[in-house]
Amino acid sequence: MALRGLIRQSKVRRRREMLPQQVGFVCAVLALVCCASGLFGSLGHKTASAGKHVLLDTWRNRKLMAPINGTPLAKNCTDPAIHEFPTDLFSNKERQHGAVLLHILGALYMFYALAIVCDDFFVPSLEKICEKLHLSEDVAGATFMAAGSSTPELFASVIGVFITHGDVGVGTIVGSAVFNILCIIGVCGLFAGQVVRLTWWAVCRDSVYYTLSVIVLIAFIYDEEIVWWEGLVLIILYVFYILIMKYNMKMQTFFTTKQKSIANGNPVSNELEDGNDLYDGSYDDPSVPLLGQVKEKPPYGKTPVVMVDEILSSSPPKFTFPEAGLRIMITNKFGPRTRLRMASRIIINERQRLINSANGVNSKPLQNGRHENMENGNVPVENPEDPQQGQEQQPPPQPPPPEPESVETVFLSPFSMPEAKGDKAKWVFTWPLIFLLCVTIPNCSKPRWEKFFMVTFITATLWIAVFSYLMVWLVTIIGYTLGIPDVIMGITFLAAGTSVPDCMASLIVARQGLGDMAVSNTIGSNVFDILVGLGIPWGLQTMVINYGSTVKINSRGLVYSVVLLLGSVALTVLGIHLNKWRLDRKLGIYVLVLYAVFLCFSIMIEFNVFTFVNLPMCREDD
């Protein structure tokens, strides 16, 4: 929890500084979608006309019914989801003449509001719940913390099932999944400023299970309707994923041992030298002895990035007394602030050790259990019988490492204006939102409100539901005004708006040297999006609210988009493997190109460019 708190507070502090970049990126995505829709819409009309013998000339002039000789025929278009929401203050003509800009600004404001609620209120309350339930790091990350980052997509899916009765929710889930895999990895690779070596186990574990989830989703939506047992299967699959995360360390140790055994041609023993049982990965459990003697492992490779998970979990070192004290102080027996400081201390110590190793200065164990060049300032004693040998072998003294960077806890406050001019403008722009949230939601990150974390959880959930409804409503109006189908708006604009904050946060984490954690978490969060983000709304509709009913999938092209999603996962993992499990600029450009190709093909499929897939959206003269 301490390391997660360190990362989250750093993300919250820096994400607000990147608000212009986030707004610019989302606006650029909307502009590209408008251009692509205008281009592919004209191409798709010819295919649709040839395939269905549509009588009308253009899609924009379609009516809800196409009567011939006064006899109404079946609809030759798809009902827009805009009619499921309250009537807009502006007519369609007024929106086309400029009023749609107000809706775009409102949607951007809702994106930012969701990011603020999730980061500053919802996620801290989830952390408190995990602490009270004494959940392990892996189980908490797979359940509550995954819900914290994917709540906007979940509520968008709920609104799509129960309110719009359309595909905007499914489109948002699919688009967000592709965005998380391709765009976030690409941005981290381009702008991290360093080469990040990825851990094969985390990527393979989440990618394999995510591939299974996508295959199941394709099988379920292929017939364009969802029945009760299909939603139940998705939920059960997520329960199995939680079990996998619960026994993650044991599985990682098992497969890592098998891999080393195959690579070396001989079996690898994990037995402890003091006669204990097999070392099954329990070294990450704070309850095990911290000063036990274990067999030597090969030294870490020379890399500018500290693999925190790998260092603290996969390769147990010989702990000295100060190091063991730090390990003890990150357990649940100590307060959150103490654990946060000790976790940052461990990270800096390990990074300094890698830097010393890269410079040719090795930390050698001494007979008295101390290490040379230790951060605690201990100096080894030379052998008095051979002073010259001691002088030759003793490396030059190293300066003490810098103190851990203090992570200043930043709380939202509508009553403190920042000093910088740019920050003042953003503060004025977001002041109504900050004031509303601070008045209605107790901030359980503050000590005085810490015991009210359940109140924070409930009120934050209500605000997320309200903001998600407004977000989907505004995006639906924008799509109807610009002639963009709901599925495309979900795959592109909604997905980008709900995922760009996570993208910026992952970039911040990657710049701090924790890119491996950021990449593996993006893939793992997609499992939650598919299995829970779709399984819960579908299950509620077909088993609770209206038992025996079905959920209709209106867009046939959505099946092809999910197939493209499956292909993007396979190509991404293949690219990571061919790049020798390194995240750099070359891999970043590769996955961003894949994301652009996915968007182009998804838009072309929805507009019937290749073959007839969907009826166009119904238009009205207003």
From Swiss-Prot:
Bias (Pro residues)? 394-404
List of glycosylated residues: 76
Which of UniProt's keywords are assigned here?
A: Antiport, Calcium, Calcium transport, Cell membrane, Cytoplasm, Glycoprotein, Ion transport, Membrane, Olfaction, Potassium, Potassium transport, Repeat, Sensory transduction, Signal, Sodium, Sodium transport, Symport, Transmembrane, Transmembrane helix, Transport
- Entry membrane topology: Multi-pass membrane protein
Which residues are on the Extracellular side of the membrane?
39-97, 164-172, 222-224, 479, 548-557, 608-622
Region Disordered, as annotated, extends over: 358-408
Biological process (GO) annotations held by this record are: amelogenesis; calcium ion export across plasma membrane; calcium ion homeostasis; calcium ion import across plasma membrane; cellular response to high light intensity; cone photoresponse recovery; detection of chemical stimulus involved in sensory perception of smell; drinking behavior
Localization annotation: Cell membrane; Cytoplasm
Chain positions of Alpha- repeats: 139-179, 495-526
KW Membrane (keyword) present: yes
> Residues of the signal sequence?
1-38
* Ranges of the Cytoplasmic topological domain: 119-142, 194-200, 246-457, 501-526, 579-586
One annotated GO molecular function: calcium-dependent protein binding
Q: What happens when the gene is disrupted?
A: Mice have a reduced ability to locate an odorous source and lower body weights. The olfactory sensory neurons display defects in response termination and adaptation but have unchanged sensitivity. Mice show severe enamel defects.
- What's any one GO cellular component for it? cytoplasm
Which reaction does this chain catalyze?
A: Ca(2+)(out) + K(+)(out) + 4 Na(+)(in) = Ca(2+)(in) + K(+)(in) + 4 Na(+)(out)
Q: Where are the transmembrane segments?
A: 98-118, 143-163, 173-193, 201-221, 225-245, 458-478, 480-500, 527-547, 558-578, 587-607
Tissue expression notes: Expressed in late secretory-stage and maturation-stage ameloblasts, with significantly increased expression during the late stages of amelogenesis (at protein level). Widely expressed in most regions of the brain, including hippocampus, neocortex, thalamus, striatum and olfactory bulb. Expressed in the olfactory sensory neurons.
Tell me where it mainly resides.
membrane
Relate the protein's function as given in its record.
Calcium, potassium:sodium antiporter that transports 1 Ca(2+) and 1 K(+) in exchange for 4 Na(+). Controls the rapid response termination and proper regulation of adaptation in olfactory sensory neurons (OSNs) which subsequently influences how odor information is encoded and perceived. May play a role in calcium transport during amelogenesis.
Q: Which family does it belong to?
A: Belongs to the Ca(2+):cation antiporter (CaCA) (TC 2.A.19) family. SLC24A subfamily.
PANTHER family referenced in this protein's UniProt entry, alphabetically: SODIUM/POTASSIUM/CALCIUM EXCHANGER (PTHR10846), SODIUM_POTASSIUM_CALCIUM EXCHANGER 4 (PTHR10846:SF21)
> What is the name of this protein?
Sodium/potassium/calcium exchanger 4
